[in-house]
């Protein structure tokens, strides 16, 4: 029997040996997908709409190979897709994109997204409902706060995906896990919006809640909201990605921290039908293919570069630098 194998974060390895009767699946996780921008800058020459135009393959073209070849890709969809509408927030940024931007996800290989975040209602309840419907029509489930979806990959793995905010209650999550299992879910994933913006280290509340979610039956907890990377922590039979930062982020043309990552997690299904987590591959990346201006095209860093190693340090929980003092390879 092959037990759970967790490699050091510095190892981006493949080729795990399979025991007889085992199947191995690969799930990819990314951070914030903000396919649009604030209306105050939407008409600028370097804004997301201006850069993308109708080339919907452009934003994810440097990373699509990872997503199109895996079994399932998941992320946090932060913003609204709709034509027109009125901003309902009095302060802060409001993110909106063209309804046609669902093609960015489908062409780029993104399969499931969470809509549980602080920008899903930037244009009110109607904006959220419109976004949900557009994603459904495109075949990309958008999961609402405290709701779940059991999705089956083309390769036959049934994954229960739960969308949460920081107020999540472990008892409620445990009940949702049981419901997903009754619907056939073999693996349970929680996509949760939590933490402190621009903090490289999870709060005590995050750590306590993340572990409670694993105790409640979740295999993988994937966090968003801080906009920067935070550590990965193995806990029991599960794993917590505290924050995967921005990924394809149309909300900021000049982000102070451009580091991001793709996490590819292997899942092992044994002959008796039980599943466990296998090898984990880290793909350190930048939110842009150039600097200092964000061109909204996430791009892997050259292996072994200063930026590549900095991402690994952040995911190991050892980073304490200033985002404005970081260097990039382009």
PLM feature spans:
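Sec-dependent N-terminal signal peptides of Gram-positive bacterial secreted proteins and lipoproteins
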Residues: 1-14
């Amino acid at each position: 029997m092959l037990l759970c194998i967790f490699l050091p974060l510095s190892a981006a390895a493949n080729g795990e040996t399979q025991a007889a009767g085992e199947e191995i699946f690969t799930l990819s996780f990314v951070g914030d997908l903000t396919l649009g921008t604030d209306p105050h800058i939407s008409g600028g020459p370097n804004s997301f709409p201006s850069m993308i135009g109708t080339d919907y393959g452009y934003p994810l073209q440097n990373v699509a190979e990872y997503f199109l070849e895996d079994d399932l890709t998941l992320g946090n969809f932060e913003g609204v897709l709709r034509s027109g509408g009125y901003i309902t927030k009095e302060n802060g940024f409001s993110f909106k994109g063209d309804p046609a931007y669902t093609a960015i996800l489908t062409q780029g290989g993104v399969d499931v997204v969470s809509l549980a975040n602080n920008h899903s209602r930037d244009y009110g309840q109607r904006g959220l409902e419109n976004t949900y419907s557009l994603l459904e029509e495109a075949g990309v489930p958008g999961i609402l706060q405290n709701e779940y979806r059991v999705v089956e990959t083309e390769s036959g793995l049934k994954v229960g995906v739960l969308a949460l905010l920081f107020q999540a209650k472990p008892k409620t999550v445990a009940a949702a896990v049981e419901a997903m299992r009754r619907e056939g879910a073999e693996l349970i994933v929680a996509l949760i919006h939590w933490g402190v913006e621009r903090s490289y280290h999870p709060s005590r509340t995050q750590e306590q809640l993340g572990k409670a979610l694993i105790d409640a039956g979740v295999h993988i907890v994937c966090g968003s909201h801080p906009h920067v990377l935070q550590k990965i922590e193995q806990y029991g039979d599960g794993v917590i990605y505290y924050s995967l930062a921005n990924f394809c982020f149309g909300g900021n043309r000049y982000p102070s921290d451009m580091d991001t990552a793709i996490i590819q997690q292997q899942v092992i299904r044994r002959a008796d039908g039980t599943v466990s987590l296998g090898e984990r591959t880290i793909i350190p990346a930048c939110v842009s293919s150039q600097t200092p201006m964000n061109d909204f095209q996430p791009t892997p860093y050259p292996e072994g570069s200063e930026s590549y190693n900095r991402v690994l340090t952040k995911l190991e929980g050892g980073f304490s630098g200033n985002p404005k003092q970081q260097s990039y390879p382009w």
